[in-house]
């Protein structure tokens, strides 16, 4: 439309990174392609256990090349996600930041930041600092995450892209629609 200017206030902070391992099957290739070509910038990758969701998320990080915040529910998932990023990409341990309850210092200038949601939601000062330099947010196991916690975090951030990962898109409490409302279809 002539005379109309599109304003995009979403944060974008480009990083350099590459993939080490190619997708293992056509399903991964298709899912990665659909997600990296989405114009609206958000969505949920729902795929069965063992299908390679963390691989696909790592692949997407290398394609979007945006500073990424990965939200997890517990320390074990944080460690597993970090190992996947280290295995599947050329991102080094020194380029990954950690935000969890036992961490005393937070380096927010890393290419990828892994955070437990419970710790991050309590650290308003950190959320404020992240609000301008995170271009991509990944919510791992989005079906079990607290909707209120996700909402608290996402209202502070303005990422260009948001991706939820789920083995099943359904919640036990029936509030599936809230996850889709925050993270997309």
What are these regions (language model features)?
Residues 6-46:
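Conserved pre-motif I regulatory segment
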Residues 100-136, 147-152:
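Conserved helix/coil segment N-terminal to the catalytic DExD/H
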Residues 1-2:
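Charged, low-complexity intrinsically disordered regions
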Residues 135-136, 143-185:
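Post-DEXD/H (motif II) to motif III coupling segment of the RecA-like Helicase ATP-binding lobe
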Residues 35, 56-64, 81, 153, ...:
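Hydrophobic residues on the short alpha-helix immediately C-terminal to a glycine-rich phosphate/catalytic loop
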Residues 38-64, 69:
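Walker A/P-loop
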Residues 76-100:
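Conserved helix-turn-beta segment of the N-terminal RecA-like "Helicase ATP-binding" lobe
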Residues 49-51, 116, 166-168:
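Conserved phosphate-coupling serine/threonine residues in phosphotransfer and NTP-handling enzymes
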């Amino acid at each position: 439309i002539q005379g109309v200017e599109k304003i995009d206030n979403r944060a974008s902070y480009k990083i350099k990174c590459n993939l080490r391992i190619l997708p293992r099957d056509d399903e991964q290739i298709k899912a990665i392609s659909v997600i990296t070509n989405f114009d609206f910038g958000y969505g949920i990758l729902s795929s069965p256990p063992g299908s390679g969701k963390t691989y696909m998320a790592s692949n997407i990080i290398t394609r979007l090349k945006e500073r990424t915040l990965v939200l997890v529910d517990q320390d074990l998932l944080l460690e597993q996600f970090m190992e996947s990023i280290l295995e599947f990409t050329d991102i080094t341990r020194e380029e990954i930041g950690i935000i969890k309850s036992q961490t005393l210092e937070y380096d927010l200038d890393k290419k990828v930041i892994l955070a437990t949601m419970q710790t991050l939601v309590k650290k308003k000062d950190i959320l404020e600092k992240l609000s301008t330099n995170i271009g991509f947010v990944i919510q791992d196991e989005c079906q079990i995450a607290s909707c209120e916690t996700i909402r608290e975090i996402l209202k502070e951030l303005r990422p260009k892209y948001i991706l939820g990962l789920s083995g099943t898109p359904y919640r036990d409490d029936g509030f599936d629609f809230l996850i889709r409302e925050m993270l997309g279809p």
